């Protein structure tokens, strides 16, 4: 639907609309065995959707490793992203100081545009014990963050599909995404995460605070974690969608 819109199609929308009967959108998938907290050797402790006890260990050890205050009841909001404008970082920089007045911690992993690298590095210096900015690419640390965080923030301006929100779900870390592209197609409120529609910093902050409030209800949060972790984002599902499409094409 988005590529039929002039904003996203960059002038090609008339052609796309004329040929929309030829279009079919299929989500990417992830390696559900490669991203499996029960067997992932990068984690501080294994766990599964049936038993999240190991995730508590992962969180405590992540806090220790990154120099964050050791607090099991403080939700960790994480971003693993390329530091680029279209990833929604201007929304984060607008309201993160306000968000950090609440009982939350913030962890960032990524590299990219130098002004964002510097900005988040300075943020970590201003909030010792609450913020960890890791300006690097580190596959091992990314797994530790996926497993140790509570909330995964992905406020992209545009995102054709996105994989990070799927990986976060697999590790029982609840995504907050903006409703664009594949993020809208993969994350559904009350089912496996939180969403907001408008590209607006305060709309994002409202949803973050909603999630942080819900986090305090441990029983309901555990149910949300289970639903997220058991969402089928495997390539098996995507492959079936491709197979169905190919069969439909053979009819013409």
What spans do the regions from the language model cover?
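Catalytic cores of nucleotide-sugar-dependent glycosyltransferases that transfer UDP/GDP/TDP-activated
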Residues: 1-252
